[in-house]
Amino acid sequence: MSGWFEISQAKDGQYRFVLKAGNGEPILNSELYKTKASALNGVASVQKNSAEDARYERLTAKNDKPYFNLKAANHQIIGTSQFYASEQSRDKGIESVKNNGVSETIKDQAV
């Protein structure tokens, strides 16, 4: 099963999206957006940029855990990964976003 995007609304009324792999695990989390339309634009940006390796910023957090950001052509962060146990697992996470980020399935959980 291929991945999908989930749009949800936070308690403060803002929106976010999460890209989930086919097994349901979250692999990319967005920032908060003021409108659902803006969150959907973020999804479109993932769909457009996720296949390009140059769009991934590979980082290490202060706790020494590897993670990554997916960036748009204008260098704005589109989404951030979870923390990984190793660089190899982070790189597998990037491959998963590359494979699932083109998904056109959007599950709207915002009510």
Region spans (language model):
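A structural feature that tracks compact, well-ordered secondary-structure segments
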Residues: 4-8, 14-22, 27-33, 42-46, ...
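Short arginine-rich
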Residues: 47-55, 98-107
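Short proline/glycine- and acidic-rich turn/helix-capping motifs at secondary-structure junctions
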Residues: 65, 110-111
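A cross-family "folded-core" feature that marks the main globular domain of proteins
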Residues: 13, 107-109
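Charged, low-complexity amphipathic helices and coil/IDR segments
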Residues: 1-2, 103
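Glycine/alanine-rich phosphate-binding loops at beta-alpha junctions
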Residues: 37
